[in-house]
UniProtKB/Swiss-Prot annotation:
Name of the molecule in the record: Protein RecA
NCBIfam families registered for this protein in UniProt: tigrfam_recA (TIGR02012)
Keyword entries, A-Z: ATP-binding, Cytoplasm, DNA damage, DNA recombination, DNA repair, DNA-binding, Nucleotide-binding, SOS response
Matching InterPro entries: AAA+_ATPase (IPR003593), DNA_recomb/repair_RecA (IPR013765), DNA_recomb/repair_RecA_CS (IPR020584), P-loop_NTPase (IPR027417), RecA-like_C (IPR049261), RecA-like_N (IPR049428), RecA_ATP-bd (IPR020588), RecA_C_sf (IPR023400)
Species, as recorded: Zymomonas mobilis subsp. mobilis (strain ATCC 31821 / ZM4 / CP4)
Compartments reported by the entry: Cytoplasm
Membership in a protein family: Belongs to the RecA family.
CC terms in the record's Gene Ontology section: cytosol
Binding site for ATP: G78, P79, E80, S81, S82, G83, K84, T85
Length: 354
C-alpha cells in the first residue's frame, strides 16, 4: 500500500509542476506580446458568433447561425446574372438598418446606385471605392478593415482584381498565377484584422470552366485556392428558373447552396425569388417556408392559413400577404420558431466541395 501512495503523491506533484510551468509560459507570452495574446477559451466573455442577416429569411435559417458571420470571410460565387451582387447588397442594407457602416469595393466599376437604393441600401452613407488595380483594391480593403469602423465590406469581384503588372503590360502578355499570388498574400495579411475588427467581408466571385476535365465538376472559381481555404462560408448561387406575369418575365427563381460552413453543418440549400427592381421577395420566402413548416396549407393551387384562404396561385398569395402585414408578421414569427425543423428539410447531401 505504501508504494501506491507514493506514486499518487508523485503524480499530483507532477501535475502541479506542469500547471506552474504552463502559468509561467502564459505570463511570459502576455509580457512579450500583450495581455490577451493567449487565453483559455472558456475565459472569453463572448463565444457566440455575431451575425448580419443575408436579407433572405431562408438563407439565414440554412446558415444555421441566423445570418452571415461577423469577423469572417464569406465567398458568394456563381454564373453571370445569378444574383451575387443582389445578395451582397441585401446584406449591406440589413447591416445599415442595424446602424452599421458599410463599404463597397467596386472593382468591376459596375455598381448601380439606383438599383442598390431599391434594395434598401442607404447610398448616401455607403462608402464606395472604384480602384484601378487589384493591389489598390486590396490595400483599400485592408485599411478599411483595420479602421475597426466598418461592419460589412463587399469586394465585387475577385475576377476583376487585375494585378498592376497585367494592366501596365501589353495585350497578350502571359501573367501566370499573378492574381492567385496577389489574393493569397492579401488574405494572409487581412485575416487577423478581420477577426479583431469583427468586420464581415464578402468576396463576390465568378466561375470558370476547367479545360479538359472529363469527370467531376468542370467549374472552378477565379483567384486561386486561397479564398476557398480562408472563407468561413461559401455560397453557390444559381438561377434555376424564370418568374412570369402572363408573358412578361418579372424575376428569377434562385437557388443558394451552402457548400462550406465552418460555423454550422453545411450542405443546406434554399430557393427564393429575386424580382427585378425589388430583389429577394420576402413574401415569396414566407409563403415557401410557411408551407415547409406546415404553417401554410397548400391544396392544389390554393394557399390557406388558419382556414383563411390566402390566394390561388403563388403570385396571388404573395399579393395577399403584401396587403395583410399583420398575418405576414404572425406567419414569420411562427417560421422563426420552427427553424430547426425547416433547416433539416434544407439538407442536400449531393453538394460537392470543389
Amino acid at each position: 500500500m505504501a508504494p501506491q501512495n507514493k506514486v499518487t503523491t508523485s503524480g499530483k506533484d507532477n501535475n502541479m509542476d506542469k500547471q506552474k510551468a504552463l502559468e509561467a509560459a502564459l505570463a511570459q507570452i502576455d509580457r512579450a506580446f500583450g495581455k490577451g495574446s493567449v487565453m483559455r477559451l472558456g475565459s472569453r466573455e463572448k463565444i457566440e458568433i455575431d451575425t448580419i442577416s443575408s436579407g433572405s429569411l431562408g438563407l439565414d435559417i440554412a446558415l444555421g447561425i441566423g445570418g452571415l458571420p461577423r469577423g469572417r470571410i464569406v465567398e458568394i460565387y456563381g454564373p453571370e446574372s445569378s444574383g451575387k451582387t443582389t445578395l451582397a447588397l441585401h446584406a449591406i442594407a440589413e447591416a445599415q438598418k442595424a446602424g452599421g457602416t458599410a463599404a463597397f469595393v467596386d472593382a468591376e466599376h459596375a455598381l448601380d446606385p439606383v438599383y442598390a437604393k431599391k434594395l434598401g441600401v442607404n447610398t448616401d452613407d455607403l462608402i464606395v471605392s472604384q480602384p484601378d488595380t487589384g493591389e489598390q483594391a486590396l490595400e483599400i480593403t485592408d485599411t478599411l478593415i483595420r479602421s475597426n469602423a466598418v461592419d460589412i465590406l463587399v469586394v465585387d469581384s475577385v475576377a476583376a482584381l487585375t494585378p498592376r503588372a497585367e494592366i501596365e503590360g501589353e495585350m497578350g502578355d502571359s501573367h501566370v498565377g499573378l492574381q492567385a499570388r496577389l489574393m493569397s498574400q492579401a488574405l494572409r495579411k487581412i485575416t487577423g484584422s478581420i477577426n479583431r475588427s469583427q468586420t464581415l467581408v464578402i468576396f463576390i466571385n465568378q466561375v470558370r470552366m476547367k479545360i479538359g476535365v472529363m469527370y467531376g465538376n468542370p467549374e472552378t472559381t477565379t483567384g486561386g485556392n486561397a479564398l476557398k481555404f480562408y472563407a468561413s462560408v461559401r455560397l453557390d448561387i444559381r438561377r434555376v428558373g424564370q418568374i412570369k406575369d402572363r408573358d412578361e418575365i418579372v424575376g428569377n427563381a434562385t437557388r443558394v447552396k451552402v457548400v462550406k460552413n465552418k460555423l454550422a453543418p453545411p450542405f443546406k440549400q434554399v430557393e427564393f425569388d429575386i424580382m427585378y427592381g425589388e430583389g429577394v421577395s420576402k413574401m415569396g420566402e414566407i409563403l415557401d417556408l410557411g408551407v415547409k413548416a406546415g404553417i401554410i396549407d397548400k391544396s392544389g393551387s390554393w394557399f390557406s392559413h388558419d382556414s383563411v384562404r390566402i390566394g390561388q396561385g403563388r403570385e396571388n398569395a404573395k399579393t395577399f400577404l403584401r396587403e395583410h402585414p399583420e398575418m405576414t408578421e404572425k406567419i414569420e414569427k411562427m417560421i422563426r420558431h420552427n427553424t430547426a425543423e425547416i433547416a433539416d428539410e434544407m439538407l442536400d447531401p449531393s453538394i460537392p466541395e470543389d
